Swiss-Prot record:
The keyword Electron transport does not apply. Its cofactor is Fe(2+). This is Lysine-specific demethylase 5B. Interacts with FOXG1B, PAX9, MYC, MYCN and RB1. Interacts with HDAC1, HDAC4, HDAC5 and HDAC7. Interacts (via PHD-type 1 zinc finger) with histone H3 unmodified at 'Lys-4'; the interaction is inhibited when histone H3 is methylated at 'Arg-2' or 'Lys-4'. Residues 453-619 form the JmjC domain. Residues 1428-1441 have a biased composition (Basic residues). Residues 97-187 form the ARID domain. The modification Phosphoserine is found at residues 986, 1328, 1456. It comes from Mus musculus (Mouse). The gene is Kdm5b. Binds 1 Fe(2+) ion per subunit. Pfam families: ARID, JmjC, JmjN, KDM5_C-hel, PHD, PLU-1, zf-C5HC2. Residues 1-22, 200-228, 269-297, 1297-1318, 1374-1447 are annotated as: Disordered.
Amino acid sequence: MEPATTLPPGPRPALPLGGPGPLGEFLPPPECPVFEPSWEEFADPFAFIHKIRPIAEQTGICKVRPPPDWQPPFACDVDKLHFTPRIQRLNELEAQTRVKLNFLDQIAKYWELQGSTLKIPHVERKILDLFQLNKLVAEEGGFAVVCKDRKWTKIATKMGFAPGKAVGSHIRGHYERILNPYNLFLSGDSLRCLQKPNLTSDTKDKEYKPHDIPQRQSVQPAETCPPARRAKRMRAEAMNIKIEPEEATEARTHNLRRRMGCTTPKWENEKEMKSTIKQEPTEKKDCELESEKEKPKSRAKKTATAVDLYVCLLCGSGNDEDRLLLCDGCDDSYHTFCLVPPLHDVPKGDWRCPKCLAQECNKPQEAFGFEQAARDYTLRTFGEMADAFKSDYFNMPVHMVPTELVEKEFWRLVSTIEEDVTVEYGADIASKEFGSGFPVRDGKIKISPEEEEYLDSGWNLNNMPVMEQSVLAHITADICGMKLPWLYVGMCFSSFCWHIEDHWSYSINYLHWGEPKTWYGVPGYAAEQLENVMKKLAPELFVSQPDLLHQLVTIMNPNTLMTHEVPVYRTNQCAGEFVITFPRAYHSGFNQGFNFAEAVNFCTVDWLPLGRQCVEHYRLLHRYCVFSHDEMICKMASKADVLDVVVASTVQKDMAIMIEDEKALRETVRKLGVIDSERMDFELLPDDERQCIKCKTTCFMSAISCSCKPGLLVCLHHVKELCSCPPYKYNLRYRYTLDDLYPMMNALKLRAESYNEWALNVNEALEAKINKKKSLVSFKALIEESEMKKFPDNDLLRHLRLVTQDAEKCASVAQQLLNGKRQTRYRSGGGKSQNQLTVNELRQFVTQLYALPCVLSQTPLLKDLLNRVEDFQQQSQKLLSEEMPSAAELQELLDVSFEFDVELPQLTEMRIRLEQARWLEEVQQACLDSSSLSLDDMRRLIDLGVGLAPYSAVEKAMARLQELLTVSEHWDDKAKSLLRARPRHSLSSLATAVKEMEEIPAYLPNGTVLKDSVQRARDWVQDVDALQAGGRVPVLETLIELVARGRSIPVHLNSLPRLEMLVAEVHAWKECAAKTFLPENSTYSLLEVLCPRCDIGLLGLKRKQRKLKEPLPSGKKRSTKLESLSDLERALMESKETAAAMATLGEARLREMEALQSLRFANEEKLLSPVQDLEMKVCLCQKTPATPMIQCELCRDAFHTSCVAAPSISQSSRIWLCPHCRRSEKPPLEKILPLLASLQRIRVRLPEGDALRYMIERTVNWQHRAQQLLSSGNLKLVQDQVGSGLLSSRWPASAGQASATDKVSQPPGTTSFSLPDDWDNRTSYLHSPFSTGQSCLPLHGLSPEVNELLMEAQLLQVSLPEIQELYQTLLTKPSSVQQADRSSPVRSSSEKNDCLRGKRDAINSPERKLKRRPEREGLPSERWDRVKHMRTPQKKKIKLSHPKDMDSFKLERERSYDLVRNAETHSLPSDTSYSEQEDSEDEDAICPAVSCLQPEGDEVDWVQCDGSCNQWFHQVCVGVSPEMAEKEDYICVRCTGKDAPSRK
């Protein structure tokens, strides 16, 4: 249940209204509370009223709307209900209007008795307000003072007339003519010259009844006034009132009020009535309405005797008979000029002398009251009349008239004297006689079963007064209006005046149906204030009627009351709604139209103190009581055992007061001397027979009587008012003795004792101070006690429950606040959680906890929480006041706030400031480490900053960051364009740009790349400069790395094109070298061919495993160095000097020679073994031997002719090498020397170049050794051994098989030189069942030197003539050898041997060679330049036709030696000089072949030994053709046999 209008408790001050609104409009007061109870609340009306009483008492009235489904049937018989309504003249209801009308009645009566007609004048087209004029003149001091002080203009202004129009003089004339005589009469000036009049004489004039005059004035309206608001009374003539308009206007005869059927007032004398009714003149030319057209009474024409009888009572003279007036009341005579004031003319009507006038006017007026209508109505006929009146009055259907319009019109009508509206009101119709509108049991209207619930409903007004909770139920008498409902049938404007209920009881009114009823209410605390205001504003009414407000006949405008600070509230009661008035609350109102209402009184337990107070108030006003309050209390006390404990407790308290008052009064009476007393059952007497004759109080407890006045009683308060007898003659009548009363009170006390104790405990708990408050558990215990002892569900218990429930809710909320944690730091959506309290609410909640009647354990904890929250607010406010707070401090405060489940308004700003602080700190940190401040970081920070709330520091940082980003993007884009520029920018320009970019405190990706590029370029230039300045020949890998680096640097490098050209030349040289040495589709690389072999004896297994990076077979251990070609290549690349590279290659040669020698002897022994080994594996296929087979000259292994390409018969004289040993084309030396010269010209070191130099040196060395061998005599023994046939093959070939080989073409393994002609005619090889098809020189018959020399001859990848010469020498007859010896130059054997021996020792000595190679590295630069610019001599073909031309041959050989020596000694220091012996050796260098042919001429071709000696040989001397010298390696005989013994 919630009231539609809620008001704060306590007195509500009146609105500061200054009266009615503009133009006199009515301003409605504020609305009273409107309650809409739920079904649960509506079930108990008294409990609900108790619940709303604190609110509704403050307004005096309230409205209750039942639940929508609560619709009781209307139980009245509409056709049988009939009543006689009251007549209500609206302008007689309002107090101030009635005072004005009474004044006009007196003025009219005065002039009527003076024989004149009252004429109300018009001033400024307005009717002159005589009442206001008379009052203002009196306030200013009277007529004489106003005239003396000339205040008429001031009075005219106060009356609302415009100044400056001489209105004051007009008003003065009207006052002097109409009001001044009346005031002189009232002051007694007209009677001062007379003796005291005899007022006891009877008069024949009829007593004047003011309220019998229905019309005080007949108004001639102005032309501008609407006719609907101007009317004439039916009996205006009877009042003899004329209106004197200031301007002639047409008399309007339209009278709206005639339709009302107003009854004619009842006159006591019909004859007088007939003689006094005059007809209104209808002539328009006469502006005055004459009430008297008879001739004036004339005294002048009487007889002489009669004239002598009439003399002036004032002057005693009978003169001036024509001025002598005769009183129509007492027949006294007065001169017109002797009267005060004097009369200028003889009145035309009946005239009364001052004495009779005073006697007539001093008669007391009758009390005002309503008249009963002459007609009896039923509901139907009354409704027809009421609807017709409202419809005609407002000229529209009744249901379309707004309630506001009716309300304003009502208050206008009650305040005007110009219009009289009469309505009728069917009020106070007894429901006992005609039946209630609610259904009752045994009623005349049958009720359906579904409507039977309304029979026993507490809201049925027949049940409410007699319910158990109502104390009126203990009154046995049926009091109409209080215990029995009254019915009210209203029409438009019918009203009920200001009043309070009898005994200040409650009242409840239910509007069954019809149009609304408008109510006005004043709270009970302002009742006396209202009474005082009405007495102040209309004191004349209270002179004759002190209890005027109890008569329900007076109303006053609510605006007037509110102007005097009386609180007034209103409401419109619609059909089906209740209006409840509270004790001593004045209320009034009117009906909006035809309706039917029912009302009754009721009294609750809380009313009992007010009821006793009301009786005391009635005693002071001498107002009778409706029932005896003490009688009701005693009746309730006599039933103490069945009373409700709450009622018993309240009655016990009231009874205690009653006993104390009775005890004191009886003691006072005893002291007065009253002795006799007797018991009397007052309840058996009618109420009018036991009233105090003084104060009208109904006596019950006691009374005083006297034998002198039997039947009369006085209460103990008015003992002295009974009679004049002495008190000892009085008799005290009492109902109970004091001893009877105490047991009755004790019975109530016993009944209520347990409850009282409980209630006392409850009250103490509810009203306890802070330090004495009880716990919530104690409150729950009190509730449990009430339930256990079945105490009634009254206000106290409900209040206790409500307080306990509130405390429990508070405890629950407090616990939630104490336990509550914020679930997230930042909420969605934003805003406030619906369950969170603000800090102010928390503060109020803590205050509420301390204001609770009980103590909660959470209160101090919550107070501490509040203190912490307030501390948090202070700290946050302090922190937020700083220009730039720390993010850590903000976060710390926010972390603290997570403990508070409270809405903190600072959190939003703190989160905003935290984001700002974090952002600023991130910006600051990023700016401090400018090297990591990237463009993306700046953009991200700017994007984050854009999303932040506006703040000065943020905006400044944003501006700086945006400026930095703009500059950074500009320079980054510029750096990007510089990097992508074509052609590329120079290093200096880019360095300048980098220097400028370094001043930007940010990380620029392209700028960093540019800076890195500039640094790389500087490093590159530095490396290039260091390479050029070092004096060393650059290594190819270094050049390639420099070129690759230079190409990757986006900077224009001046040296890069030169290096690229140099690298290109090197690659071109390598391609040329590869074409020279490698056959097509060769599986060997150039480096493999040029370097000593590393895969000897493994049949390529090592190489394959090296390519697959797989481990060697088990049992094989990997060598630490030079194990493979990659090791050798790596060693060459790592060598910094040429001498180191030569040493590495020399070591590789020694390993090669040792491995190959071992392999040769192993294969030879395998093939020459006398026992045939079935497990012997030969050939590439590693299978057993099978004819025909061919033997490799170098590795000495046998190969199936089906597995390899065997040489044909025509090629059988040539040396055959297997696929493993045949590695290159073995070009002649003349084709290799240009490669070396071009390499020296290029001045770049590369592994292939080092290998080529070593190969040439090895070739020359081998040539030298071979020539020494050929020139020595040691070769003859070897020749004899080979020629004697000591060496034979194990598998000689048959003739047939040999011939079969003729069809085989020459394989690529055959050498280019030819053996002697008888080589293939030897028969020693043809008797074996197996034949190799190609025989080799035997190994066992050769010396190690020869064997090594032959072996190295095949290892050399150069074709040399010494190889052919050596083989020819070994395989030819001795005669051929001798012939060859003869054809050689003349040289002693000792000299040749010495020379050859010396050279052989120098070449073949590894220690000496390794010692000399580092010395050769220091070759001075001038020699390098000489070698570089030296043109390589063109190879000349050998001219065998000039064998004697030794000079040319020696010159060509010397040139070859110079090239080799220059390459070997380019690293020698500049101060190193050759010895004379070495110089002479270079100058006298000859072909070291044993059988040198000493060719002469410019076209002598040389070939260098590829072995370890590196000696140069004539191609023709060693049997190497130019093609072989170009495609194949050449190893001299000495190198072939030298290393064999050392590797065994």
